[in-house]
Amino acid sequence: MPQSLHPGETSPRSGSTLWHALRAASPTVILMLALALGISDAMFTVLDGFLWRPLPYPHPRQLVLIRERLLKAGLKGTWVSFHTYAALRKGTPFIRSAGTVDLTGGPLTIHGVKHVAFGGFATPSLFRTLAVPPLLGHWLSRASGRPGGPEEAVLGYGFWKSAFAGSPAAVGERFRFNGKRFRVVGVMPRSFFTIYPGADFWIPRVLTPARMRDHNINHVMVARLSPGTSPRELNAWLKGYRNRALAAASPARRLRAEQDGFTIDAEPLHKGLLKIFLGGKPVLLFLLALIGLLLPLIAIVNSINLTLVRTRRRAAGFAVRRALGATGFNLFQAMLGESLVTLGGVILGSLVVAGLGCSLFRTLIRSALTGPVSIALPFTIRFGEFSVIYGIGTALLIVTTIQFIALFFAGRESLLGTLVHEAGERGTARAARFMRRGFGAFQVLMATVLVMVGLVIFQSLVNILHRPLGFDPTNRVETMVITPHHVSMARFWTEIAPALRQIPGIRHAALGYMVPFNNVMSSHSTIHTPARPNESLYVRTQKVSRTYFRTLRIPFVAGRNFTSAEERDHTAVVILSARLARRLFGTVDAIGRTFRPFGPRSPRATVVGVVGKVSWRATPATNIVGMMYTPLTYPGYKFGAGNVILKLSPGALNHLRRIRKALEGAAPGVAVTQMTRLNTLIRASDRLFLGITEITSVFALVALFLTIFGVYALTAQTSLNRHQEYAIRTAVGASPASLNRMAFAEGCWMLTLGLPLGVILALFLSHLLEGVLYGIPGLDWPVDLLGILIIVSTVLVASWVPVRNIAQADWSHLLKSGAA
């Protein structure tokens, strides 16, 4: 006689033993949820590091970047002029303190040993604004920022470790830089950074009266808001300040400011750093977050479906328990107890996947953002408390929800009959059929979005890798050369050019302020078209040797190269890119035209040549009109650093040490950085987009796999429930083609419901990415159609395989199993 059951108990046969719990756990559900939740956990850990984790400053929300921008001219950076800094530092009630910082670098001598170091010119008030206590010593004193003040320096943590072996005795030591002796007064902690996180040292920026009248917009200003002040209040005040300043300016200056779209505003420091480190495209983070969110949704739908299938098989047992007095809560407790193994497996697996994913994403992002130079990032990406809490919380919530949904459908008498009696006039009950098709359509929708967006990003990467460079990087190397303050680059090149020609293996050599795909140094200017309305254009400008174009094989579209006399005699001549020539003069044939490139008081320059378009970075900057090249001796601006580019013959890499020695011996105090192949620079600049493509591709493949599995599982379960019907149809003469049509009909229902919505959402996301990705139009029909074809073929094949297997089976056996 069978033993009676109390409400909520299980039978001895099924048991509430550990072995029964292990058998009740579905490895497929554990694998799917662990993989999807782990990837999602890793992705949200990245978002936490970039978006939600505060910067390592006291009260970081009070920090803002003040910026002057010429919106109509294309100047949209994060810089100000010293004139504006001096005016705002004392005259703004909403700013508690402020400071500026600029990048510098060069040869630095400590105890007779030369180092190549990059640092910052910082006003002493910058450290008080950021308010990070020093690790050793103290900040730059206020007196050091005044004319005639002490020559002080603060070291960065990394340089302190490498140059002074991390010794506390470094405080008080002296080093020579730019012809001056500086005394070390402090060392900053490892986590400290300004706008340039890799700085080795900071020395005081002395603001003389003449410098405070400088209107050139090329300095970084960080300000701390007064307590209780919001950036919106400061921006309202800055707008009024801008209007008052223009009202007091001359009519010509006021007109020019209006034509250029001159504005002054403040941006939170966190937001500004995101734009700087992500190439002005922080929307890429939200794209990855969206993709990371879709995977768990697909896995959840699959898990719900599998759990429902298992629950339907136990529907009779649930009915018996309900008849014996078990409540819905008792059944839920029993199912949840059986799911503890599943829950533990999902939590453990998701945390393992999340830890591996965080490590992978951190390495990938650091490599993508810093390139071949490893520097400290202002954002912390680590697997910590947030990741563990997120993983455990989401796993607990999702597994509990799945069990509740399964119990809701299988534990209620009204729905129990619907799910148990699936044999109806057309094979399945309406509710079960609707639920099955709804699950399938949702999976199709999510997979369509991931596959189509993944293909769009992949197409962008292909466009990047096959973009026209405008120069030849093969067998070219470059190195940055930094000269002492008193040695001009023109003089340096005069000394070194003959020596380089004597070294075997060097076919061509050149010097320029910038080299393509090296983002360490850049120079931009706002110039105006010579004809009215004198439109403002934001352009790249650089001084180059006359061998620059031949060394990089940059083709001339019109005109000629600089002559030796023009390079020697300070002649005001320029070479323009083809796009800039069209914007300035309306034609590429601009040879002999003249204009004033650096303002109405600058010398009038003559155009002697026009060259083709050159790619300078992984994705083109839409706000930069073109490039203007000038000779090394062009009158006006000076620079103390540049890039030497060498065209080497095969096998000449053995002479790099001799080349470096020649460069360092050209003038006393010259510093030379590591030599890098141009092809290496190009690959490094593509790493961000390559990494995003790799992540998206992995997500898309996982989503496609989950969709195939989900559609196959749905169709297989339907086929299993209808196998007797299929056997009868086969027995009375139905052809395999008719059964295949029935299977394809189920797949078409899923496609009809899910594919259109998925395509619409994917096209919408592609439209948002149009300004972020390279070479992607709003609609790319070949790529979009390929994505649709992949989804359609995947769903139809997954729908057809289970029916094919049943159609090939022995129909008499199917009839007997169905009768049983």
Predicted regions and their residues:
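Mid-to-C-terminal secondary-structure elements
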Residues: 119-142, 151-283, 363, 494-688
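Alpha-helical transmembrane segments of multi-pass membrane proteins
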Residues: 20-25, 329, 333-346, 350, ...
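Alpha-helical transmembrane segments of integral membrane proteins
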Residues: 2-27, 272-277, 307-333, 337, ...
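Small-residue-rich transmembrane alpha-helices
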Residues: 45, 265, 304, 340-415, ...
